[in-house]
């Protein structure tokens, strides 16, 4: 039996089941924890001055990690409250945030939180590319897709996203290993999101080319 916490392929849901988060709120839930992370790292010393109890957590990057974990839990809780499901991608990312964030705070070593994007993106890339290797286009189970594509379209889109996730993992490794913590945090918030948006927009011609019309759906 499928556990209700995991979101099924939208094509298998009835209209009554498709309780969706409004687009602006969905964007806020995705960006909110990252903005909290950026603000806490950039203004950590100010926060510690105003709230001395926070000094026990440590340097700004550790305070940012703790608040990032809290904001991630809140975002997932809001999503669950509104839809009674959790999309696979935010759920897995949230679990990794909590695990690596806890290691960061426990061991007082920011390497763990810096490696979190590498782990998450490598995992998603490996799942998508591994699925293709076994003849499965798994993209529909990773994204809350509202569109329908033919088999070739799903294969191409899955390949592109799989390679893109691997690219993001490599970029994260290069940035955190060669630049300052502040530079890495800024790139994580203000670099990755624009890159992802541009990449997503570049996929629109492929999506339009391989979209199934109503006639295609009826025939299938």
Swiss-Prot record:
Where mainly located? membrane
Task: Report TM segments.
Answer: 20-40, 57-77, 86-106, 123-143, 156-176, 187-207
Q: Which Cys-Cys disulphide bridges does the record give?
A: none
Q: Where in the cell is it found?
A: Cell inner membrane
**Topology of the protein relative to the lipid bilayer:** Multi-pass membrane protein
Keywords for this protein? Cell inner membrane, Cell membrane, Membrane, Transmembrane, Transmembrane helix
Question: What GO CC annotations are associated with the protein?
Answer: plasma membrane
The yes or no answer to whether the keyword Transcription regulation is present is: no
- Family indicated by similarity: Belongs to the YciB family.
Q: What is the documented function of this protein?
A: Plays a role in cell envelope biogenesis, maintenance of cell envelope integrity and membrane homeostasis.
- The protein in question is named Inner membrane-spanning protein YciB
What gene name is given for the protein in this entry?
A: yciB
